[in-house]
Amino acid sequence: GICGGYQMLGERLEDPDHVESHVATMAGLGLLPIVTTFARDKTTRRVLARVLPGGPLDAAAGASVEGYEIHCGRASVRGGAPVFALEAPGGAPAVDGTRTADVIGTYLHGCFSSGPLRRALLTEAAARRGVTSDPRWGADLHGGRYDRLADRVAAALDLDALGRLTCRPLGVVTA
């Protein structure tokens, strides 16, 4: 599960300030040992991470993953193992996600853009079902189409002027 899916896979969702709902506490699916508490502050940030060894993603251990977080709330992890080691230059070491032998949850949107992660997950799922895996499973899903589109948009826009209008330079990621 990613983001809200991660939260729902946990034991419980708590919303004492009624940020997301009028219900203060709701049972989760109980598939991951986490409890989510919603908060008024929203986390929005770009993330660079590495896949941690073990579990269903073990074949991708050490692979680089990039994506973003956008969520209200924090997961209190009560067991399992983390999925990703977050790379925070100059920051304290941190982890994201929770995994058990069969279930993985994370706040990291975009993690499936990593070919090694995608290949590891699909190969593991195939093995569990007795299906032969395909080495192309980790290939670029879009054949660079998004990169070509981004290049065309950048060529057609005055990014400096757009940056002045938004009061920050474009191309710079802020956490």
Regions flagged by a language model, labelled:
Residues 93-175:
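Acyltransferase
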Residues 54-101:
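Catalytic beta-strand/loop cores that center a nucleophilic Ser/Cys/Thr
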Residues 29, 70, 109:
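Hydrophobic, well-ordered secondary-structure elements that form the walls
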Residues 18-21, 48-52, 86-91, 124-127:
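Short, low-complexity, polar/charged sequence segments that are solvent-exposed and flexible
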Residues 25-29, 54-57, 92-96, 129-133:
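Glycine-rich loops and low-complexity Gly/Arg-rich segments
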Residues 11-15, 34-38, 76, 80-81, ...:
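Short, well-ordered loop/turn and helix-capping segments at boundaries between secondary-structure elements
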Residues 1-57, 61-66:
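Cysteine-nucleophile active-site neighborhood
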Residues 2-9, 47-49, 73, 138-142, ...:
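A glycine-rich phosphate-binding loop feature that marks nucleotide/adenosyl-phosphate handling sites
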